[in-house]
Amino acid sequence: MGHTAHNKTKLLNRVKRIRGQVEGLERGLDEGRDCGEVLQLIAAVRGAVNGLMAEVIEEHLREHVASPDLASDERARGADDIAGILRTYLK
């Protein structure tokens, strides 16, 4: 079982909180809130997404790169996977 399946409930709860924050941002824009409030809402969404990403990355590194049970080619593949994902995420 993969680490995302193992932590499914915890990760889904984070996603639901992010959804709520995005809905709050949408309401703020729809209601014409001032730019400072909108920026604060955007920062909250960004922080929540970054937190989710960090949690999944950490577990990926533990399971697919740092696990002592992995062969060196499996570790290299895990490191390559995460490097590509980080490149895409940080664009």
Language-model regions, residue ranges each:
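Solvent-exposed interaction patches of small proteins and small membrane subunits
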Residues: 1-91
